[in-house]
Every structure is written in structure tokens, then in C-alpha cells.
Amino acid sequence: AAGMGFFGAR
């Protein structure tokens, strides 16, 4: 789970 979470937080 390191796709939407990363881009979402950024």
C-alpha cells in the first residue's frame, strides 16, 4: 500500500 497513500498525502 504505497501508491495512493503516498501520492494522496503529497
Curated annotation (Swiss-Prot):
Keywords: Amidation, Neuropeptide, Secreted. The keyword Zinc does not apply. GO terms for cellular component: extracellular region. It is found in: Secreted. The modification Arginine amide is found at residue 10. One of its GO terms (biological process) is neuropeptide signaling pathway. It comes from the Eukaryota. The keyword Secreted applies. Contractile action on the inner circular body-wall muscle of the animal. This is Urechistachykinin-2.
